[in-house]
């Protein structure tokens, strides 16, 4: 290198310091678009917008906590110049040093440059060259397969030419040269160019003179390249002489040369393996050489890329090559030496190599010794530099150690010493064991570069480059090599027979089996070096990296080894290794597959050398393909094999990249990391068994190649593979991990996951964090998974499963951080189980714990830093947060909201930007991971993980692909539609796989298994259900994906997939559990999956809860079969959404992150919660005649979902700000992930519904239909409340934020009393007690209704709970109403079956009885507000229903139908998760023909709102604790009034007032102000009031519920129900008008066709509004028009808003300018509330209570600008002039277009309005007065006058006019 290592280090340190200064404190990335705040802090514009979007109103500066607003942000051009200069410096540094500055920031840039060029050239070249080569390969003989593998179907000379050309191409693109080198046959010139560039013309010339033959004629570089290829000996020798500068060129040239030479040699000596290997090596060298030569930086980058491509390939090739040439005596050493040989003594030794391939290989090794040492030292320095710069140090040490561990490290070092100066050597070393981390670095950098390139290439060529081991046409050449090895081999591997010739050839060539690999490792000859390398590499990361390419085993080993190697520098290594593995790994996997088969075929010892060489070459090619392709997107490879799925995945990947602003590289890395993880996973599998490995690899291969398809087949394969036995299940898990990784394009992630697991073993927290830095996007999600994994680590096996699950779940980016940790844990623990203990441990041992710890601590600090500001750009934050959470569960909880919010926002942004594109993918990763992890953690980690993981894999992969489209799932609900079709197949596949997984899981989790199985079967059996499930899943995916894309989107999506796949309540439960986290997961899982454990865990709940659990399972299964499938589907959808929502929070939250003890605590809490929930549900179930089992299960589910919510609440409680952050998450869930949040609650409700639905089917079906909304909602609310309660209890014993102390009581009571034992009345009592209001009344009501009022009691419970949840459960209550609405009796009734109708009739009869009882109770307790509150609510509702059963029913039906419509509407808009969720709800409703389904649907809606609110409100409600009680009292009073006055209105009003109080209070209590731009806080506020409403609403809600029952009754036939619903809308309107005199306005409006616009709302909130509008048939427009009747503003609790154009126009037009709370409260109450109570009172500028909107609305006959002629002159910012003119026109003014148009006359008052700050000419507006005799005022005069709706005096706003002479 030009600079000494020390010098380079110093420079890099300086650059690093500069970079740190110039990085955004929020996202920790180089600030791309710097904006400065008032406090002079610089942030990314993206981060700040994300932060500001989180909270409406002033947000706080993350650094100084000063208030910041969007207006206060100013672009900092100077800072951006600094960043640009820094990037230039880094670029120059890279060019000067030939080293890639390992940095995510630079990666992106370099990737953009080099990858694009490479993509272009490589694409073209590769496509042509590879294809032709592929054809040639196909034509060529088995010996050619090696050539084929290299993509050198060309003759030996052809190989040389190709190499040269490739090198040339590499040089030409230089940064892109990596791709190009494999690009075309005619890349000799390029190769030569590449060689000359960095290496230097002199040395090249030297090389060329010595080695020049024909190619010397080419320019030095070309000559060198040609020499490399043609003049093998000469070139090699020349290269050796010029080791320092030519090192890169030399090495590359050497590599090329050996390849070429060997190619010639092969043709000459006919040693195809050698030739092939040489060629592969050449390609690698070529790549390295070209890249390095190109410019050290570029070359190194390319080299990194090459290493990424080649490390596995090159190493494997080198290993095999070395093994083949060296006779495999020191296979390990030979491979490293071989490369080194080529590098150090390329000419002589290569000649020897070529001629004396075996003999010379040893010679080279000896020769290599010194150079290797030198090279190692230099590489070490470089690595240290990289480590300091990014994360290479640990890797370097590991690699060095590994190399040394490998036989000939010393020799290699010697050889490398000669070549060490140049990066190419380094790369070789990297390829060898010596410089693994540099290889990793190179790879990671290349991954970054190639990721971008690949993205572009993928876009252009459909992921062709992904497997660009040799050529861009990975599908072609890779098909020859990779398709031959990848496709053919996957087939063979899948089949396990040596079906393909190529495979056979490879196997024969490779002679490497997973077993052979181990055996060969024992062998001392040719096999030994490579085999040992593989074995040792598995043990020693260095060898493993190289060996991965050698065989499938090696691949796995490589993954492990890489992980280990990387582990020393956990983040750097992992990141780079991820990148490296991503590129190399998919190919590696392909190659591994190939090699596995080759190994199998390679049983022949004689041919082993040649075969290995061939295999090595092929492997190298495959790796290279992967490097270039995987580098881009692992999905590219997948695309090639499975272009459709791949396409989706590519999209997914691209989207992942796109959504994450700075995360493209990281995401790519993440995507690739899963592949790495997969490899690692494969490796354990491999070790476990060849067959397993094969299966794993085929899956991986298929995953990589076919993507989605691969997933499917692989999944089936996995299913089969897993089904056979638990070990297989584990294997399947691994396979799935591989599959998910590859499919999800997470080879790296998986690999990283594995590696990180090692790190995690060292430092769970650290490793979690470690991943975070590496993963920018997926990391966020990864973190939670990681954290979970970390926690799981404590639970070795569960963690193991979790890790794999994490890998699956976070196939995108989560796995990067999480999976790695998990994976290593998994490997450490699971592998021990999976026979990979040695490797895992070895890896762990290999990695220096101190290094890992240090790295992880650093990462942790980084994570902490990021965690402080969880923004969209914090892709790694979730991971980091997770890491932190791992250490601090509370912290996690707190941050998890952030992460969730981040994810949500990310998702939101992504959804917005690529709502139909990619958010889901990341979401998939994130969501899937947390879900799986958590799900797996408690009970069947391995199995759950595997199952969940498998499902997640498929789900996330298919979904990933689908979510690639659905990626915006949260936002891009639309994508689900795209993906729904894929989802169906995916679902089917996932279902199948999940089913098998579930079956296996069932073995362990008996009850769970049946349910899951049932769910799976149910889904398959019910196509419509499946489609619904798919839709729902899609919706859920969208929602959950929106949820977790923001954090748990992936999880949810995966969870959704799993749920859908499992299509079982248990699945949902598991998902919920997973999402929720270990606590709930353990709880639910133990309870549900393992009733015994659950029983044990649940002391109080032991008897019933386990029983319930089992029963639940059975019943759930039954429900799933009978009523559950649709319901479950909807539940799944809902649940995943909710789960996602909660999962994000909880998953990140301590649930999974909690230690086992913590988990146990959580579990106990969860159990209590479940107990509580079960009790509630049991009560409901008992009353509703739902079996307790289903209800407990439902409750458990609900508890899980809500529990997760509670956890969030917990974190909220613990950290109000965190809660706010979480709240935004929920809000995002609500809007971007609206569906998700409600989905969770809905899910729970759906689960409850499912359980209920079963019982209901028996007897409660009708009641369920009517009660489904009510009772289910009640249960939901109750359960959610209970869940919240238990979670809250867990968190802070204030599940119902409105009753913290009561919550404790409730929890205590619930805990003390078995939920089932408690019975409804007891539960009701508890709830009442919790509420503290109407406890006795509720008990009375419960007792009275207990038998007959299942629904009523449910309502009461719900109300009670809602009132208890009070504000906290307001969401639930609202949910109840929403549920009713959502249940959309119309759709519900529509779907009602005859059985349901009968059941409904029975239920209606019971309801009537209950109503009578209620009336009696109400009469008795009418004067007892506190006691009769719940009763009153229920009673009033019942009474109301009794009084106006039709009306109430109609209303409820209307609400339901509206809600349903709204949901579907949301669904249609889809941009929001809520919409999708709504779709799900709707589909759920429509498709849920059974009450459960209906219930699910209603649940869903409420969940959407309620859950959102529940979570928001949880903390809020806790804060609202007191308001809640007050509200309860108020509500009681109101209810009494209601009873007197038809309560709904009063309730609404009263409840609204308390709500306002609550809103204010909760927010204040929460420390969140709606205005603080915290969507969550808003929802909290909203929910707080809604909680109060819930308390109040109960009467109306009950009424709604009862009417709904009646509606169901009246609509006992689906048609009738539908009619009722459809008619119900009008009826509801009427009933609203009747019941709510004050609601008359809105009712009238409803009758009159309302039209509304929204302003200042987040996407989640907008989705909620959209649903609301849809439900109430309100037109929702983007722009305010004359027809607009309502302007919905985002306000704080005091109804103070920001001034927006719509705000002004709404006031000027006399519209209803109402708070967003109006929508949320109306949704909660299930009816349109009176706008009066929600009218905006003021704004932040003109005063908080100026009543301008009211004044304007009531003074439309008195226009404030009447008689004025106003000319809006000049430019205006933030609003078009025509809008300003319209505004003044609406206020009565006459608009004058030109100053000259003013008419002078009496009674006319001309005014000129200008905006001085919009004028570019400083004094232009000062001379306006010269043109007309009119006063000139600022625009503020208009705005202030309009806002206050009072014409302001002009004096304050006059602009002094300068005389014309002065102008």
Swiss-Prot record:
Glycyl lysine isopeptide (Lys-Gly) (interchain with G-Cter in SUMO2) cross-link, chain position(s): 109, 301, 339, 443, 459, 519, 583, 654, 734, 739, 918, 987, 1079
SMART domains for the chain: BRCT, RING
Bias (Polar residues): 705-716, 1373-1395, 1445-1470
ZnF start-end (RING-type): 24-65
Domain BRCT intervals: 1642-1736, 1756-1855
PTM entry text: Phosphorylated in response to IR, UV, and various stimuli that cause checkpoint activation, probably by ATM or ATR. Phosphorylation at Ser-988 by CHEK2 regulates mitotic spindle assembly. Phosphorylation by AURKA regulates centrosomal microtubule nucleation. Autoubiquitinated, undergoes 'Lys-6'-linked polyubiquitination. 'Lys-6'-linked polyubiquitination does not promote degradation.
Keyword set includes Cell cycle: yes
Reactions this protein catalyses: S-ubiquitinyl-[E2 ubiquitin-conjugating enzyme]-L-cysteine + [acceptor protein]-L-lysine = [E2 ubiquitin-conjugating enzyme]-L-cysteine + N(6)-ubiquitinyl-[acceptor protein]-L-lysine
Residues modified as N-acetylmethionine: 1
One MF term in the entry's GO annotations: RNA polymerase binding
One CC-aspect GO term: chromosome
Region (Interaction with PALB2): 1397-1424
SUPFAM superfamilies attached to this UniProt entry: BRCT domain (SSF52113), RING/U-box (SSF57850)
Residue numbers bearing the Phosphothreonine modification: 1394
Positions carrying Phosphoserine: 114, 395, 398, 423, 434, 551, 694, 708, 725, 753, 840, 988, 1009, 1143, 1189, 1191, 1211, 1217-1218, 1280, 1328, 1336, 1342, 1387, 1423, 1457, 1524, 1542
Keywords: Acetylation, Activator, Cell cycle, Chromosome, Cytoplasm, DNA damage, DNA recombination, DNA repair, DNA-binding, Fatty acid biosynthesis, Fatty acid metabolism, Isopeptide bond, Lipid biosynthesis, Lipid metabolism, Metal-binding, Nucleus, Phosphoprotein, Repeat, Transcription, Transcription regulation, Transferase, Tumor suppressor, Ubl conjugation, Ubl conjugation pathway, Zinc, Zinc-finger
Subcellular location as annotated: Nucleus; Chromosome; Cytoplasm
GO biological process, one term: negative regulation of fatty acid biosynthetic process
Domain of life: Eukaryota
Pathway: Protein modification; protein ubiquitination
Region (Disordered): 230-267, 311-338, 650-739, 1181-1216, 1322-1395, 1440-1505, 1565-1598
Biased composition (Basic and acidic residues): 248-260, 327-338, 727-737
Function in brief: E3 ubiquitin-protein ligase that specifically mediates the formation of 'Lys-6'-linked polyubiquitin chains and plays a central role in DNA repair by facilitating cellular responses to DNA damage. It is unclear whether it also mediates the formation of other types of polyubiquitin chains. The BRCA1-BARD1 heterodimer coordinates a diverse range of cellular pathways such as DNA damage repair, ubiquitination and transcriptional regulation to maintain genomic stability. Regulates centrosomal microtubule nucleation.
Domain notes per entry: The RING-type zinc finger domain interacts with BAP1.
Protein name: Breast cancer type 1 susceptibility protein homolog
Organism: Gorilla gorilla gorilla (Western lowland gorilla)
Gene that produces this protein: BRCA1
């Amino acid at each position: 290198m030009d600079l000494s290592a020390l010098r380079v280090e110093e420079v890099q340190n300086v650059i690093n310091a500069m970079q740190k200064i110039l990085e955004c404190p929020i996202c920790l990335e180089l600030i791309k678009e710097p904006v400065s705040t008032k406090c002079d802090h610089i942030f990314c514009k993206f981060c700040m917008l994300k932060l500001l979007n989180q909270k409406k109103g002033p947000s706080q500066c993350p650094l100084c906590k000063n208030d910041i607003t969007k207006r206060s942000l100013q672009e900092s051009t100077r800072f951006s110049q600094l960043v640009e200069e820094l990037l230039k410096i880094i670029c120059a540094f890279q060019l000067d040093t030939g080293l890639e500055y390992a940095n995510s920031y630079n990666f992106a840039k370099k990737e953009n440059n080099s990858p694009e060029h490479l993509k272009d050239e490589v694409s073209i070249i590769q496509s042509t060259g590879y294809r032709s080569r592929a054809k040639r390969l196909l034509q060529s003989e088995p010996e050619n397969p090696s050539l084929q593998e290299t993509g050198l179907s060309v003759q030996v000379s052809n190989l040389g030419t190709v190499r040269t050309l490739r090198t040339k191409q590499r040089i030409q693109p230089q940064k892109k040269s990596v791709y190009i080198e494999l690009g075309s046959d005619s890349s000799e010139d390029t190769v030569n160019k590449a060689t000359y560039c960095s290496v230097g013309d002199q040395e090249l010339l030297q090389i060329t003179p010595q080695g020049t033959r024909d190619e010397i004629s080419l320019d030095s570089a070309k000559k060198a390249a040609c020499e490399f290829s043609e003049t093998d000996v000469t070139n090699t020798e020349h290269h050796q002489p010029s080791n320092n500068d030519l090192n890169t060129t030399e090495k590359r040239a050497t590599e090329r040369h050996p390849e070429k030479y060997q190619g010639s040699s092969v043709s000459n000596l006919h040693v195809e393996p050698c030739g092939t290997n040489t060629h592969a090596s050449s390609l690698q060298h070529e790549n390295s050489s070209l890249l390095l030569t190109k410019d050290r930086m570029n070359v190194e980058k390319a080299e990194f890329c090459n290493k990424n491509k080649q490390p596995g390939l090159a190493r494997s090739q080198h290993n095999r090559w070395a093994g083949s040439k060296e006779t495999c005596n020191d296979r390990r050493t030979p491979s490293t030496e071989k490369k080194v040989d080529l590098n150090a003594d390329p000419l002589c030794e290569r000649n020897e190599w070529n001629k004396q391939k075996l003999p010379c290989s040893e010679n080279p090794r000896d020769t290599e010794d010194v150079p290797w040492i030198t090279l190692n030292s230099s590489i070490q320095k470089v690595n240290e530099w990289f480590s300091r710069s990014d994360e290479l140090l640990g890797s370097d040490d590991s690699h060095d150690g590994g190399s040394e561990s490998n036989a000939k490290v010393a020799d290699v070092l010697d050889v490398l010493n000669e070549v060490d100066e140049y990066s190419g050597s380094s790369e070789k070393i990297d390829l060898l064991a010596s410089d693994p981390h540099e290889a990793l670095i190179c790879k990671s950098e290349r991954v970054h570069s190639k990721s971008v390139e690949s993205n572009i290439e993928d876009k252009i060529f459909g992921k062709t480059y992904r497997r660009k081991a040799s050529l861009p046409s990975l599908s072609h050449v890779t098909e020859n090599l990779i398709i031959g090895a990848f496709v053919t081999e996957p087939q063979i591997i899948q089949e396990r027979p040596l079906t393909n010739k190529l495979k056979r050839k490879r196997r024969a060539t490779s002679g490497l089996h997973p077993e052979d690999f181990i055996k060969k490792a024992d062998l001392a000859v040719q096999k030994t070096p490579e085999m040992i390398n593989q074995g040792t590499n598995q043990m020693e990361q260095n060898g493993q990296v190289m060996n991965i390419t050698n065989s499938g085993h090696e691949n796995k080993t490589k993954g492990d080894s890489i992980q280990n190697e990387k582990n020393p520098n956990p983040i750097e290594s992992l990141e780079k290794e991820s990148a490296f593995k991503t590129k190399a790994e998919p190919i590696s996997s392909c190659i591994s597959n190939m090699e596995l088969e080759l190994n199998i075929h390679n049983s022949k010892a004689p041919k082993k050398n040649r075969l290995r060489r061939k295999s090595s070459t092929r492997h190298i090619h495959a790796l290279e393909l992967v490097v270039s392709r995987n580098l881009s997107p692992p999905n590219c490879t997948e695309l090639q094999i499975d272009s459709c799925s791949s396409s989706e995945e590519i999209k997914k990947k691209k989207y992942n990249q796109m959504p994450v602003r700075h995360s493209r590289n990281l995401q790519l890395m993440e995507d690739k990391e899963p592949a790495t993880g997969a490899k690692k996973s494969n490796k354990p599998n491999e070790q476990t068994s060849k067959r397993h490995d094969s299966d794993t690899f085929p899956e991986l291969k298929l995953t990589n190649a076919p993507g989605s398809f691969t997933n499917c087949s692989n999944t089936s394969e996995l299913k089969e593979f897993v089904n056979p036995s638990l070990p297989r299940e584990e294997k399947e898990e691994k396979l799935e991990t591989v599959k998910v990784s590859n499919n999800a394009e997470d080879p790296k992630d998986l690999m990283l996951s594995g590696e990180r697991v090692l790190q995690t073993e060292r430092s769970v927290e650290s490793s979690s964090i470690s991943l975070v830095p590496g993963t920018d996007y997926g990391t966020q999600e990864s973190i939670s998974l990681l954290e979970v994994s970390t926690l799981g680590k404590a639970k070795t096996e569960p963690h193991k499963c979790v890790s794999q699950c994490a890998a699956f779940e976070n196939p995108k980016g989560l796995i990067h951080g999480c999976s790695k940790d998990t994976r290593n844990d998994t490997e450490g623990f699971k592998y021990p189980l999976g026979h990979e203990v040695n490797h895992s441990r070895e890896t762990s041992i290999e990695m220096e714990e101190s290094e890992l710890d240090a790295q992880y601590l650093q990462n942790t600090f980084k994570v902490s830093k990021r965690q402080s500001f969880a923004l969209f750009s914090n892709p790694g934050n979730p991971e980091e947060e997770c890491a932190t959470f791992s250490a601090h569960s509370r912290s996690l909880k707190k941050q998890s909201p952030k992460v969730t919010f981040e994810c949500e926002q990310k998702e939101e942004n992504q959804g917005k930007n690529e709502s139909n594109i990619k958010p889901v993918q990341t979401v998939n990763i994130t969501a899937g991971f947390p879900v799986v992890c958590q799900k797996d953690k408690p009970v069947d980690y391995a199995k759950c993980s595997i199952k969940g993981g498998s499902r997640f894999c498929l789900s996330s992969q298919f979904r990933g692909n689908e979510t690639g489209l659905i990626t915006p799932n949260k936002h891009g609900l639309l994508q689900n539609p795209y993906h729904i079709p894929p989802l169906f197949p995916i679902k089917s596949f996932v279902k199948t796989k999940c089913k098998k997984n579930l079956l296996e899981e069932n073995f362990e989790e008996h009850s769970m298994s049946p349910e899951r199985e049932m769910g799976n079967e149910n889904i398959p059996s019910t196509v419509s259900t499946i489609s619904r499930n798919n839709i729902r899943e899609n919706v859920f995916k969208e929602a959950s994906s929106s949820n977790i894309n923001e954090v748990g989107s992936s999880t949810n999506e995966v969870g959704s997939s799993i749920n859908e796949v499992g299509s079982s309540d248990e699945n949902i439960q598991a998902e919920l559990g997973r999402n929720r986290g270990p606590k709930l997961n353990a709880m639910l899982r133990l309870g549900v999956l393992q009733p015994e454990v659950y029983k044990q865990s649940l002391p109080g709940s032991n008897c019933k809860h386990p029983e319930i659990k089992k029963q639940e399972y059975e019943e759930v299964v039954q429900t799933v079969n009978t009523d559950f499938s649709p319901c479950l589907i909807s539940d799944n959808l809902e649940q995943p959404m909710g789960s996602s929502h909660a999962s994000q929070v909880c998953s990140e939250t301590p649930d999974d992150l909690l230690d086992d003890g913590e988990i146990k605590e959580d579990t106990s809490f969860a159990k209590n919660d479940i107990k509580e929930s079960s009790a509630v549900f049991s009560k409901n179930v008992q009353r509703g005649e739902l079996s307790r089992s289903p209800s407990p299960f439902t409750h458990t589910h609900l508890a899980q979902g809500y529990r997760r919510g509670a956890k969030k609440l917990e974190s909220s409680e613990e950290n109000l700000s965190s809660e706010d952050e979480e709240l935004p998450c929920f809000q995002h869930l609500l809007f971007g992930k609206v569906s998700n949040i409600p989905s969770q609650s809905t899910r729970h409700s759906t689960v409850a519904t499912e359980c209920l639905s079963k019982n209901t089917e028996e007897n409660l079906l009708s009641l369920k239909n009517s009660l489904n909304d009510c009772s289910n909602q009640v249960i939901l609310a109750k359960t959610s409340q209970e869940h919240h309660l238990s979670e809250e209890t867990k968190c802070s014993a204030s599940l119902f934020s409105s009753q913290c102390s009561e919550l404790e009581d409730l929890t205590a009571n619930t805990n003390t009393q078995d939920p089932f034992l408690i019975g409804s009345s007891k539960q009701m009592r508890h709830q009442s007690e919790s509420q503290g209001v109407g406890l006795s009344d509720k008990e009375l009501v419960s007792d009275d209704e207990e038998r007959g009022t299942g629904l009523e009691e449910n309502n009461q419970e719900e109300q009670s709970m809602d009132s208890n949840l009070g504000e906290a459960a307001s969401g639930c209550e609202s949910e109840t109403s929403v549920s009713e609405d959502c249940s959309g009796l119309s759709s519900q009734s529509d779907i009602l079956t005859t059985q349901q109708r009968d059941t409904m009739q029975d239920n209606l009869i019971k309801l009537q009885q209950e109503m009578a009882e209620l009336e009696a109770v109400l009469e008795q307790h009418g004067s007892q507000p506190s006691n009769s509150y719940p009763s009153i609510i229920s009673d009033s509702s019942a009474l109301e229903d009794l009084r106006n059963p039709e009306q109430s029913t109609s209303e409820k039906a209307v609400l339901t139908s509206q809600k349903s419509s709204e949901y579907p509407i949301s669904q249609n808009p889809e941009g929001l998760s809520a919409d999708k969720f709504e779709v799900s709800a709707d589909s759920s409703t429509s498709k849920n023909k059974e009450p459960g389904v209906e219930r699910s649907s209603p649940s869903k809606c409420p969940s959407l709102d309620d859950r959102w609110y529940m979570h928001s409100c949880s903390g809020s409600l806790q804060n609202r604790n007191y308001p809640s009680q007050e509200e309860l009292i108020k509500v009681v009073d109101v209810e009494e009034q209601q009873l007197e006055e038809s309560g709904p209105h009063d309730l609404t009003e009263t409840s609204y007032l308390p709500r306002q109080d609550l809103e204010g209070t909760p927010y204040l209590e929460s420390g969140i102000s709606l205005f603080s731009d915290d969507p969550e806080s808003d929802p909290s506020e909203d929910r707080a009031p809604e909680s109060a409403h819930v308390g109040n609403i109960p009467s109306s809600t009950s009424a709604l519920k009862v009417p709904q029952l009646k509606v169901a009754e009246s609509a006992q036939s689906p048609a009738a129900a539908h009619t009722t619903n459809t008619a119900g809308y009008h009826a509801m309107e009427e009933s609203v008008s009747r019941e709510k005199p004050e609601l008359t306005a809105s009712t009238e409006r409803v009758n009159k066709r309302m039209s509304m616009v929204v302003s200042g709302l987040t996407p989640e909130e907008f989705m909620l509004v959209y649903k609301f509008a849809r439900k109430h048939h309100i037109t929702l427009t983007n722009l305010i028009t004359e027809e607009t009747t309502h302007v919905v503003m985002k306000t704080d609790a005091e109804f103070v808003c920001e001034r927006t154009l719509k705000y002004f126009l709404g006031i000027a037009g006399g519209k209803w300018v109402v708070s967003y709370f109006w929508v949320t409260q109306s949704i909660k109450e299930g009816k349109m509330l009176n706008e009066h109570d929600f009218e905006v009172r003021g704004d932040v500028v003109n005063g908080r209570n100026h009543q301008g909107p009211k004044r304007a609305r009531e003074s439309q006959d008195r226009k404030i600008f009447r008689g004025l002629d106003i000319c809006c002159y000049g430019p205006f910012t933030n609003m078009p002039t025509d809008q300003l003119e319209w505004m003044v026109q609406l206020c009565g003014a006459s608009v004058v277009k030109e100053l000259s148009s003013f008419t002078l006359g009496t009674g006319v008052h001309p005014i000129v309005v200008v905006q001085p700050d919009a004028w570019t000419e400083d004094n232009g507006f000062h001379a306006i007065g010269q043109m007309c005799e009119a006063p000139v005022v600022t625009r503020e005069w208009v705005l202030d006058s309009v806002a206050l709706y009072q014409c302001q005096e002009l004096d304050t706003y006059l602009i002094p006019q300068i005389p014309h002479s002065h102008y």
